Design a protein with these regions (language model features):
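Dynamic "connector" segments at or just before major functional cores
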Residues: 1-233, 255-258, 438-477
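Acidic, metal-coordinating catalytic cores used for nucleic-acid/nucleotide bond scission
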Residues: 241-248, 268-270
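Structural motif
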Residues: 54-63, 319-320, 390-400
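An anionic, glycine-rich sequence signature occurring as long contiguous blocks
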Residues: 1-16, 261-365, 468, 472-477
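Short, glycine/acidic-rich hinge or "gate" loops at secondary-structure transitions
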Residues: 83-85, 98-101, 238, 417-427
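C-terminal, non-catalytic "cap/extension" segments appended to globular domains
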Residues: 382-396, 410, 414-477
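Short amphipathic alpha-helical "interface-anchor" segments enriched in bulky aromatics
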Residues: 34, 82, 340-391, 398, ...
């Protein structure tokens, strides 16, 4: 036992260090329960290609995947954090393959193994960076959303899902392969594509791209793949919603040829401004004290388009501004299928995707910092390997997909918490108010006691029972 005394004006504070099993991240147990119900780490470990020598394996692939997914979900973004939390009792209980007391104590009463170290996680990310493993990670990213949906929907797919497509700047430090200066964001960034499900709030797919690419580069292939996969496991019909950077002829024609409904904003230019000019007049009468919006329908063929398409002019009035504002939407829906007001309402719900992007960057904070400098020789022999630049980029993409999986797992717990407590909750709030709970772990002959403060214990028991009742078992609702 270590003691330290600090004298103050009115009292003496004493600090003691005791060999007890304590934790500041008890929320890892909630994530493990949700992960068990989803079957995420278990099923993912079965299909990921593991090229390690079995005779030298200390941590199973399932344990390493749990570590790589749960730590970001708890708010720990760096690989070094695994060393800091290596002996945290609750985190070890949550991540270990062993059940019960054996997760913390060996049969000879010695302390069981801790979490995988930072070098171990580096090797994991490198192993997951192969083309096959990244494809598997992507499939399970979509599958995680599908399983959560079916758990609350009687095992059925949803009838209709809107997929939001956008790019996201991720700033990096140092010289990372693929990170390039982007003048629009005035920073060194990666510029990945991200697809989210508007009605669900889950991330469906991500694709890492160099920082200087245009917003729409590689967009069509990415979108069609997401839609194809979503309609197999998530919904019967998937529609696409895009921002102004995506609707070029290739993308629109590709979506129409596959029968995928879409709505997208179009960038204003001199031609569109001239077309809108006759409609930018206020209606007769006294201006209202609140803003108002009206729409105009037309069909028009842009010079770069192969045919005319339905355009909707959106005009907005702000009482505090002298001039009217306007923007344009293009859509594949006919007026009978979705009239202008419905279309505008649909597009404005794109704010849910912006919220997902913000939460991903604020709460999970993907750390894309792999810059491999591989050895060229070992004991006089040349080592065959992929180029360091290409491998580092692939490792960063694998880390981004794992961050998205961490977001979906935390989101699954967040959705249960919102229903249990009847109030909204952000991922950051979930991490700070529910996950970061101090606890003492005590071991008895046949059980483990998690001792929480009395004011949080009741809330925790409610949330635990709700997660445990979800129909995630064996990956089926």
């Amino acid at each position: 036992m270590k003691e330290s005394h600090v004298s103050g004006r009115h009292s003496i504070v004493q600090f003691e260090g005791r060999p007890e099993r304590l934790s500041c991240e008890t929320g890892a147990l909630l994530l493990r329960e949700a992960d068990e119900r989803l079957g995420l780490s278990r099923d993912l470990a079965r299909v990921v290609e593991d090229k390690r020598d079995p005779s030298r394996v200390v941590h199973s692939m399932e344990e390493l995947l749990r570590t790589a997914i749960m730590l970001p979900a708890l708010g720990w973004r760096d690989q070094d954090d695994a060393d800091f939390l290596r002996w945290d009792a609750a985190v070890r209980l949550a991540i270990s393959d062993r059940r019960g007391i054996s997760a913390l104590l060996n049969s000879d009463k010695t302390e069981a193994k801790g979490l995988g170290s930072q070098p171990t996680l580096c090797r994991l990310h490198e192993g997951l960076s192969s083309d096959r493993n990244r494809s598997v990670l992507r499939e399970f990213l979509m599958e995680s959303a599908a399983r959560r949906l079916k758990a609350g929907n009687g095992g059925h797919r949803q009838r209709y899902v809107t997929i939001d497509i956008d790019s996201l700047p991720i700033e990096v430090d140092g010289s990372q392969p693929g990170a390039e200066y982007n003048g629009h964001y005035d920073a060194e960034i990666f510029h990945p594509l991200i697809a989210t499900a508007a009605e669900l709030g889950d991330i469906l797919d991500v694709k890492l791209r160099p920082g200087s690419v245009h917003t729409a580069e590689g967009g069509l292939e990415f979108i069609l793949n997401v839609v194809r996969t979503a309609e197999k496991s998530l919904c019967q019909v998937a529609a696409v919603r895009m921002d102004a950077g995506f609707p070029d002829e290739e993308t629109l024609q590709g979506l129409e040829s596959q029968g995928v409904p879409y709505v997208a904003r179009i960038k204003n230019n001199a031609v569109f401004d001239a077309m809108a000019e006759p409609y930018l007049t206020r209606p007769r009468g006294r201006p209202p004290t609140e803003g108002r919006t009206w729409t105009c329908e037309m069909s028009y063929q842009v010079q770069s388009w192969s045919r005319a398409r339905r355009l909707v002019l959106i005009i907005t009035e702000n009482p505090r501004e002298l001039f009217l504002n306007h923007f344009w939407l293009v859509t594949s829906w006919t007026e009978d299928e979705k009239h202008a007001e419905e279309l505008l309402s649909c597009y404005r719900q794109r704010g849910t995707a912006e919220g997902v992007f913000g939460e991903l960057m604020d709460s999970i904070e993907p750390a894309l910092s792999s810059n491999r400098r591989p050895k060229s020789h070992y004991r006089g022999q040349t080592i065959p390997h992929r180029s360091g630049k290409n491998l580092s980029f692939a490792v960063n993409e694998a880390r981004l997909i794992l961050a998205a999986l961490a977001f979906n797992l935390a989101h699954a717990v967040r959705c249960v918490a919102e229903k249990a407590f009847q109030k909204g909750l952000t991922i950051k709030g979930l991490q700070e108010k529910i996950f970061k709970v101090a606890a003492r772990v005590t071991l008895h002959a046949r059980r483990i006691n998690i001792i929480l403060a009395s004011d949080v214990c009741e809330r925790w028991l409610t949330l635990w029972s709700k997660i445990n009742c979800l129909g995630f078992a064996n990956g089926r609702a």
